[in-house]
Structures are given as C-alpha cells and as structure tokens.
C-alpha cells in the first residue's frame, strides 16, 4: 500500500487485490453515491452488476485501487488493471483503431475501469490526486478509459489532464448509456 497524506485530514492510498476485496462494500457504496446522480443516473441493475464484478476485477493481474479519505470517511476512488494481450477493449469501436495502436502486451495500457469523487468533495483536486496516484504507479506506457458522452464536465476535466478521444463504443446492458467515448492518455503522470 502506498500512503500519501495530502493534508492533515486527507489521505490517498493505493491498494492491491487483498485490500481491495476488504474494501469492496465501501467502494461499491461510493460507486452508487457517485453514479446515481446526473449526468450518469445509474440504475439498480448497474449497481448490482458493479457489486458483482468488482471482486472479479480485483483478482486480475496488476489490479490497483486508489482511494481518498478525509479523516475516516472515504470520499473518492479509482481502480483498474493492465489490459491483457488478448483484450477485447479495442474491438467493437465505431471508429476502428489500427492494429499497432490496439496491440497489447499485458503491461502497455492501464485501463481505468471506474473512478469517482463524492459530489460535495469535487473541485478541490481530490480527483486529480487519485488519478495521478492510480496511474503513476501502474507501470504502463499509457492509459485508457471510457466515459459517457453526456458527461460533458467529466470529459472536459479529462481533456485538461491530457486525455484524448480515439473512438466510441457501444456497450451492453446493464450499462445505462449505450454509447461511451473511449479516451487514451499517452503521457502518464510522473512522466510529465
């Protein structure tokens, strides 16, 4: 676990599989609190799906969970894993990417699967700190994530942090939005 105290009361920590599994209930509650609000408007099926797949994700090689706490209260999170060589991440894109771009080694690209900060804690840099900590220790050359096109504010934040859209992808239920933008960050935090 990496521990970075940001203020007297705020702490950023990165966890591996075992710690992530112990925090699963807390992370799933945070996910629901973040993604039940506009513009995401998550539903019960999405939240049940996230609770079901989080433990499976935590067991993937290279999985990382980064959390933010203010005192004892968890206020934000981000998690993901390196894309395996046989990934389907780059398939079913509306605008296909070339073979070289889509080639994965198991360490080339870190996929940010879910990421969020409680609404009353946004705008204070918490999200950026989670983002940088999660990615800087991943060992990957680049990162990718998906974001709903209607999440205009979120997309703008990612753009300011250096992410760019490479395509969009149709998602399967119970994901609430059928279409997601696929973004890539090619200059990882710590390399800037």
Name every feature range the model reports, one short phrase each.
Residues 1-25, 29, 33:
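Conserved N-terminal entry element of GNAT/NAT acetyltransferase domains
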Residues 28-44:
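Helix-loop element at the rim of GNAT/NAT acetyltransferase active sites that forms part
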Residues 41-65, 69-71, 75, 79-82:
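Active-site rim helix/loop that mediates acceptor-substrate recognition in acyltransferases
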Residues 79-116, 173-176:
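Conserved acyl-donor/pantetheine-binding loop and adjacent beta-alpha core of acyl/acetyltransferases
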Residues 114-119, 123-136, 156-160:
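Conserved acetyl-CoA-binding loop-helix of GNAT-fold acetyltransferases
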Residues 127, 131, 150-154, 170-177:
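Short glycine/proline-centered loop/turn elements that form peptide/ligand docking sites
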Residues 136-150:
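Conserved GNAT acetyl-CoA-binding A-motif
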Residues 144-146, 164-179:
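Conserved catalytic-core motifs of GNAT/GCN5-like acyltransferases
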């Amino acid at each position: 676990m990496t521990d970075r105290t940001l203020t007297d009361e705020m702490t950023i920590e990165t966890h591996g599989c075992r710690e992530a599994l112990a925090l699963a209930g807390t992370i799933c509650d945070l996910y629901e609190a973040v993604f039940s609000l506009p513009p995401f408007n998550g539903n019960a099926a999405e939240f049940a799906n996230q609770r079901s797949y989080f433990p499976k994700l935590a067991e993937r090689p290279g999985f990382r969970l980064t959390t933010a706490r203010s005192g004892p209260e968890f206020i934000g999170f981000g998690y993901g894993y390196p894309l395996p060589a046989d990934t389907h991440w780059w398939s079913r894109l509306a605008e296909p990417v070339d073979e070289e771009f889509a080639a994965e080694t198991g360490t080339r690209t870190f996929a940010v699967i879910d990421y969020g900060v409680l609404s009353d804690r946004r705008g204070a840099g918490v999200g950026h700190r989670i983002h940088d900590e999660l990615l800087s220790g991943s060992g990957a050359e680049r990162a990718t994530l998906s974001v709903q096109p209607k999440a205009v504010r979120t997309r703008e934040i990612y753009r300011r942090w250096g992410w760019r859209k490479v395509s969009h992808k149709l998602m399967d239920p119970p994901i609430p939005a059928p279409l997601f933008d696929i973004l890539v960050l090619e200059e990882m935090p710590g390399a800037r």
